């Protein structure tokens, strides 16, 4: 079955007032639990805010941070992109921010 990355940008939740964060957290945890119960959850979580990231490109090391950094993500194991989009919509409502959906391309040399 295909796996899909569902992610949001690092500052996508900056518009949410601090007093609303407990409700957002609870809603997000409810969607995670729903995905676990449905057997589609692979893993997920938030990423630390970028400070001085290092990115290696063509052997060159460059200091970050970069505005397009991922702030949070999850991976779901579902039969289709349409199903992944349904989960992304649930996450978007819970997190109050847009989500990006991308299919993982398996590496046939390692058997995943």
Where do the PLM segments sit?
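Conserved, structured core segments of small domains
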Residues: 1-112
